[in-house]
């Protein structure tokens, strides 16, 4: 009876000893992780105090942004700011990113939960290759744990690159709210006041003859300009603040038409406005050719010119529509 009891005590003692021995490396590894994490945070805080947006290359990016352990988020802007890249959008996005990072750095809510960094293609091309990136600028949130998800990549073409829009996206991904307070812009009110003053002056000078206020051609032209501006997407640009165009940093190819139906470039708005104006001018010429009292030769020329403008610009407009809505089956003259 004593032998089994003695054997049981030996087994229990061995199990406890093994458990204690196994805990020693685990605790040591945990302390090592904590030490590495503290060193990372101290380094990032030191760089942030020097410059709100930390410039990174591959040697800094891999250990501080990609490698664990991390208890902080890093908002990284991948860009191409060198002059020979000729990326105008990159410079504009960088200005907004710097504004946002400065507001965060000098706000009372500043903590070490989130850091701002940038990787320039000419300084960290290996990072671009590692992430399979072929466009700039691009904003990505690297969360404290795990890999970035699809929503952690900022939709630049949809939201634009204003500091306020990026701040809303950061709040959605990290629960960190950054207030961007800009000084008031008085250019708009001043221009409106100047326009009203000019109109008031003209009305005062022509107060004896107010027939120009009832000029149908003038009002029709003003209404047409307003309609063309609104149908081309000017209001969407005003709300979203999209880039003027997009230049691929690798190939140098500039895209003026966005490939998605969910976004557009400012240049695309100007192109659509021009095409709508061409179609409108063609319709006006056709109407004038039908109702004018001019000789038949001039009316025939106006009719041919009107048909040519409508056909040409409508075909171009339809080709743009097809390039944005890839399943659209119809085309006219141009595919």
Curated annotation (Swiss-Prot):
Its main location: membrane. SUPFAM superfamilies: Thioredoxin-like (SSF52833). InterPro entries: OligosaccharylTrfase_OST3/OST6, Thioredoxin-like_sf. Residues 1-29 form the signal peptide. It is a multi-pass membrane protein. The keyword Glycoprotein applies. Pathway: Protein modification; protein glycosylation. GO terms for biological process: cognition; magnesium ion transport; protein N-linked glycosylation; protein N-linked glycosylation via asparagine. Residues 30-184, 231-270, 322-335 are extracellular. Glycans are attached at residue 71. The chain crosses the membrane at residues 185-205, 210-230, 271-291, 301-321. It comes from the Eukaryota. It is found in: Cell membrane; Endoplasmic reticulum; Endoplasmic reticulum membrane. Accessory component of the STT3B-containing form of the N-oligosaccharyl transferase (OST) complex which catalyzes the transfer of a high mannose oligosaccharide from a lipid-linked oligosaccharide donor to an asparagine residue within an Asn-X-Ser/Thr consensus motif in nascent polypeptide chains. Involved in N-glycosylation of STT3B-dependent substrates. Specifically required for the glycosylation of a subset of acceptor sites that are near cysteine residues; in this function seems to act redundantly with TUSC3. Accessory component of the STT3B-containing form of the oligosaccharyltransferase (OST) complex. OST exists in two different complex forms which contain common core subunits RPN1, RPN2, OST48, OST4, DAD1 and TMEM258, either STT3A or STT3B as catalytic subunits, and form-specific accessory subunits. OST can form stable complexes with the Sec61 complex or with both the Sec61 and TRAP complexes. The association of TUSC3 or MAGT1 with the STT3B-containing complex seems to be mutually exclusvice. PANTHER family: DOLICHYL-DIPHOSPHOOLIGOSACCHARIDE--PROTEIN GLYCOSYLTRANSFERASE-RELATED, MAGNESIUM TRANSPORTER PROTEIN 1. This is Dolichyl-diphosphooligosaccharide--protein glycosyltransferase subunit MAGT1. It comes from Rattus norvegicus (Rat). The gene is Magt1.
